[in-house]
């Protein structure tokens, strides 16, 4: 039997810099027509987790997305926990930004 070569439509061996990158990839694949279960199988995560990441990317304010992305590089302290993002992204963008500032200010010795 001849081994199958991976097709360009299947992401293989991708390394993600962090959860934000993973979420953006999930959203991209979803926009390309992949179902939640298919994405979940491809990245070995639960369908619920994948759907939550997609929802965060769809609903997060630009400030939240920029902060979340910056946290992956280690330039700022981590405040964008996934469970917090899922909850806060149900709010309007101005409220999301207020909650982000409140969360940053609540950290002891925080770096903006």
List each language-model region with its residue ranges.
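Short, Lys/Arg-enriched anionic-surface-contact patches
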Residues: 2-24
């Amino acid at each position: 039997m001849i081994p199958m070569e991976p097709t360009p439509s299947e992401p293989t061996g991708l390394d993600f810099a962090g959860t934000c990158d993973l979420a953006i990839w999930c959203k991209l694949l979803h926009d390309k027509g992949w179902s939640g279960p298919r994405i979940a199988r491809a990245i070995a995560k639960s369908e619920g987790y994948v759907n939550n990441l997609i929802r965060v990317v769809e609903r997060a304010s630009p400030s939240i997305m920029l902060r979340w992305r910056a946290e992956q590089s280690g330039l700022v302290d981590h405040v964008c926990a996934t469970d917090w993002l899922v909850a806060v992204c149900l709010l309007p963008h101005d409220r999301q930004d207020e909650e982000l500032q409140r969360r940053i200010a609540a950290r002891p010795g925080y770096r903006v």
